[in-house]
Design a protein with these regions (language model features):
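Conserved N-terminal structural module of periplasmic/extracytoplasmic solute-binding proteins
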Residues: 4-8, 13-114, 120-136, 184, ...
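Mature extracytoplasmic/periplasmic domains
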Residues: 33, 47, 115-117, 122, ...
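A local structural motif
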Residues: 65-79, 181-182, 270-286, 323-328
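Pocket-flanking alpha-helical
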Residues: 80-117, 131-159, 170-171, 192-208, ...
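Hinge/lid segment of periplasmic solute-binding proteins
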Residues: 106-167, 342-383
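Extracytoplasmic/periplasmic solute-binding protein
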Residues: 146-163, 168, 192-252, 300
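C-terminal capping/gating helix-and-loop segments adjacent to ligand/active sites or protein-protein/ligand interfaces
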Residues: 153, 428-431, 452-526, 531-533
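Glycine-centered hinge/linker elements that transmit conformational signals in sensory
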Residues: 195, 238-284, 327-380
């Protein structure tokens, strides 16, 4: 799917990057005219912004096939950061003029006549100009996350498609790491050793004793499934959400006893425990922009976040440079849960585990550390590739009442092209759409253009792009796609302590085992009453 980077597209993008907005005729109108050749688009202006929309709409309109099919093509863009705007407008039915929404999850409309069923008109159609179906070009786990299956049925359909493929993990201040002589941790034990070292440093450049910060949006939640799946393996992680226990028994409440969940809770407890001093407990009171700004002003070394940090913070970062803050932010691969050595008998300790991880990062496909078996090497290699994305809750959908359905469908198909993927990356500081496309190798000229303007400050977008090229890389499917989560109310935690904050901040003396047992009790007490109800609601009983 590699294509030459087109001069015409670059012209549009350069104009946008330079601050010039190119509008097609009629785009200045405040309200669409319900003409089937006018595409009114809504974009939720969050982490990836809205700057990618207009150049993509413009380039779409310049396609020869689009000009022939829609000779009177116009577009209009509505943009805001209101959380529920998309859902409320879709609910207006025929009174809504917006033909295409790029919003948050619209899952509540799946299976209804409110949205266009995209199964045949988008997912099973060929990507324009490319010899591949839309569904096949999409990253597998992202596609799987969009599947709609009614409770108790096996049919699959699609009512929405993702418009982002964000990768989450730890963003860290690379400049500070170097100044403090810190090494990026390969394992969770190394993470905590580093945090202990930071507590003892006497450094005027970083005058805090904690290492990790967060925001009021609990980004820490995005690390939980990664550590969990690292330990259990992706298939066992998915089996939890399917209700299949380690013995292969279906509809089994024994899934709540998965050891990987306990091991991850132990990591969380260690991070949150106040006496350890690893975590800035006040940071959870900051809104996301204020919290992320503290990374730029040297008030935290690292933060659970995502590659959207690049785009979200770029303007603020430029302003902070005038105040002397000019550090480089990077994204590290999530440290591997050290307890994985319980499942790799030839890897005897954390030092050996770290050495194996370094070999994997260097591209090795067989162990060089003495005594390590190929089987254990592959277990760690698979764990190193585990990633988590919330892209599946950034969804695009077409209201069934739209008068421009065909036009909206064609635009969604165009978004899968290499050309559209490139436009998106250049206008989101390296963000990516949910397709099998690598900017670095598929559009190297555009990649170099992006890196020349953004790499000095932000490299996490490039980091994530590189990570996804690893043949062992795997994005976990969104847990909300599983019937037990969607219909049965199943989650990562439950009961008396439904969140990490309620467990380890509000109740500072709780242990990971107590939180773990709380979830088991919630689902199994009274002879599995809640669990059986969840199974019935999910159509599994």
């Amino acid at each position: 799917m590699k294509k030459q980077w087109k001069t015409a597209t670059m012209t549009v993008l350069c104009a946008v990057i330079a601050g010039t907005t190119l509008l097609s005729a009629g785009c200045g109108k405040k309200k669409a005219d319900n003409n089937p050749q006018t595409l009114e688009v809504y974009i939720w202006n969050a982490g990836y912004g809205d700057q990618w929309v207009k150049p993509m709409l413009e380039t779409f309109g310049n396609q020869k096939w689009v000009k022939e099919k829609y000779p009177e093509y116009k577009y209009d863009v509505v943009s805001n950061d209101q959380q529920n705007f998309g859902e409320s407008r879709i609910n207006q039915g025929e009174n809504n003029t917006i033909a295409l929404f790029f919003t948050q999850s619209v899952e509540s409309f799946y299976g209804t006549d409110t949205l266009v069923d995209l199964t045949e008109c988008v997912f099973n159609q060929q990507v324009p100009g490319e010899d591949v179906l839309y569904k096949d070009k999409m990253i597998d786990s992202m596609r799987e996350s969009m599947v709609y299956t009614p409770a108790g049925e096996i049919s699959e359909s699609y009512y929405a498609t993702p418009w982002a493929c964000n990768i989450s993990g730890f963003v860290y201040n690379e400049t500070l790491f170097k100044e403090l002589n810190l090494t990026v941790p390969n394992t969770t034990d190394e993470l905590f050793s580093m945090a202990e070292k930071v507590k003892t440093l006497k450094n005027s450049e970083y005058n805090h004793t904690y290492s990790i910060a967060t925001t009021a949006i609990s980004y820490m939640n995005y690390l939980f499934p990664v550590w969990w799946a690292q330990y259990e393996g992706e298939s066992e992680y998915e089996n939890y959400w399917k209700g299949i226990d380690s013995e292969g028994v279906r509809n089994s409440s024994a899934v709540f006893s998965q050891t990987g969940r306990l091991k991850t809770l132990e990591i969380m407890q260690k991070i949150y425990t106040e006496n350890n001093g690893y975590y800035d407990r006040t940071s959870s009171t900051y809104d996301f922009m204020a919290g992320q700004t503290r990374m730029l002003t040297r008030d935290a070394l690292m933060m659970p976040c995502g590659d959207w940090f690049s785009n979200e913070m770029k303007e603020l970062a430029q302003g902070l440079k005038t105040q002397g803050y000019d550090d480089t932010m990077r994204m590290m691969k999530t440290p591997i849960v050290s307890a994985i050595i319980e499942k790799t008998p030839s890897i005897k300790n954390d030092a050996m585990l770290s050495a194996v991880i370094s070999e994997i990062d260097a591209g090795k496909t067989a162990p060089e550390t003495a005594g390590v078996t190929q089987k254990d090497f592959e277990t760690v290699r698979a764990a190193r590739g585990v990633m988590y994305s919330i892209g599946s809750v950034h969804t695009s959908a077409i209201p069934a009442a739209s008068t421009a359905k065909d036009l909206a469908v064609d635009f969604l198909r165009f978004m899968a092209t290499d050309e559209a993927n490139t436009i998106y990356a250049l206008n989101t500081s390296g963000g990516r759409l949910p397709f099998k496309f690598n900017l670095k190798t598929d559009a190297p000229e555009a990649y170099n253009e992006l890196m020349s303007t953004s790499k000095e400050t932000f490299s996490m977008a490039a980091d994530c792009s590189d990570y996804l090229t690893d043949d062992y890389a795997s994005i976990l499917p969104y847990y909300g796609k599983f019937a037990l989560a969607r219909y049965g109310g199943m989650g990562m935690l439950a009961g008396e302590y439904p969140s990490f904050e309620s467990a380890f901040i509000s109740n500072a003396n709780l242990t990971a085992k107590e939180v773990f047992d709380s979830t088991i009790k919630y689902w199994t007490e009274n002879n599995n009453a809640r669990w059986n109800r969840a199974l019935r609601n999910a159509g599994l009983l």
